[in-house]
Design a protein with these regions (language model features):
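A glycine-rich beta-to-alpha transition motif near the start of alpha/beta enzyme domains, typified by
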Residues: 1-112, 162-278
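N-terminal, positively charged, Ser/Thr/Ala/Gly-biased leader segments
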Residues: 1-24, 132-156
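Short, flexible active-site-adjacent loop segments at beta-strand->alpha-helix junctions, enriched
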Residues: 103, 122-124
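Intrinsically disordered, low-complexity regions enriched in acidic/Ser/Thr/Pro/Gln residues
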Residues: 116-120
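C-terminal domain-closing interface element
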Residues: 126-147, 155-156, 260-278
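Selected transmembrane alpha-helices and immediately adjacent juxtamembrane segments
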Residues: 152-153, 160-164
């Protein structure tokens, strides 16, 4: 059979999205692995399946898989793409939707300009200083990235996250900084390192890397945690634009003080429609 699909791009991540409401198919992990191949298949970072929900009070269900065919946790960027497609194809005839995802039901709104707002639970944050080796912090005073005696460690549901506030993220030689971090074992492999530049009270610029893996150029859950921390510290207003990936990825975040939810607004683009033989 020929299976209809859509290719979407949102906030630095490309998705293959399959509507299983208007068509039926039994999709197995080996299919997903073949389709994820960027040379011989469709090529994608993640795959989203739109399905009929189990709960009658929910508009649709969405499951997310990686390129190996393993079901993974959802990202806000996934929901921006899926909700935009559902609205464009009129699978659901309303702008405000309730979406059933892995271990959650989320409220999503598609706006007239195509952007999508997702209501997210505010991350619970723990911050503590982490001492750096003396040899590591003894950098020349003229270095624009000369460090204090410790990073701020931010711990949330996504794991350990070390952040450093700088004047200009573009002046930091990150390859050199990462080399020092790995050499001195200041932080465990897999830790996320973020440089934060507060451009204004409405704009936060972030560069992110993962030790042992490289640059993070898509909108990850860590960015929501960073935005909440910056708001708690008084660096940002309660509504702010967050930019990462050298300015190629941006989203708007709103968090009212002491509110249990925050509102994430991002964009998504439909690249093309296609069919693939199952």
């Amino acid at each position: 059979m020929l299976l209809r699909f859509s290719k979407m791009h949102g906030l630095g991540i490309d998705l293959m999205v399959i509507d299983l409401i208007s068509q039926y198919a039994y999709i197995q992990p080996q299919h997903m692995r073949a389709w994820s191949d960027r040379r011989c298949g469709v090529g994608f970072a993640r795959l989203a399946l739109i399905e009929v929900p189990q709960d009658p009070d929910v508009d649709f269900s969405c499951r997310i898989f990686d390129g190996d065919g393993v079901e993974v946790d959802w990202l806000a960027s996934d929901l921006c793409c899926v909700a935009r497609l559902v609205a464009d194809k009129r699978l659901i005839s309303k702008a405000q939707m309730r979406v059933e995802v892995r271990q959650a039901v989320l409220d999503v709104q598609v706006h007239a300009d195509g952007s999508v707002t997702v209501a997210l639970e505010k991350p619970e944050l723990l911050t503590e200083p982490t001492a750096l080796a003396q040899a590591f912090i003894e950098q020349p005073r003229h270095a624009p990235w000369r460090l204090d005696s410790c990073f701020t460690m931010l711990t949330d549901n996504s794991g350990s996250h070390a952040l450093l506030r700088v004047v200009d993220v573009m002046q930091v030689p990150m390859a050199e900084l990462l080399e020092h971090l790995e050499a001195h074992a200041c932080l465990p492999l897999g830790s996320v390192i973020s440089l934060l530049q507060v451009q204004s009270r409405q704009t936060l610029i972030v560069q992110m890397w993962q030790l042992g893996a490289g640059v993070i150029d898509s909108f990850s859950p860590d960015l929501c945690a960073l935005a909440v921390l910056a708001m708690q510290q008084g660096w940002l207003d309660r509504q702010a634009q967050i930019e990462c990936g050298n300015g190629t990825v941006s989203a708007h975040l709103e968090w009212l003080e002491n509110a249990p939810q925050m509102y994430f607004t991002g964009s998504a683009t439909r690249i093309y429609e296609g069919q693939i033989r199952l």
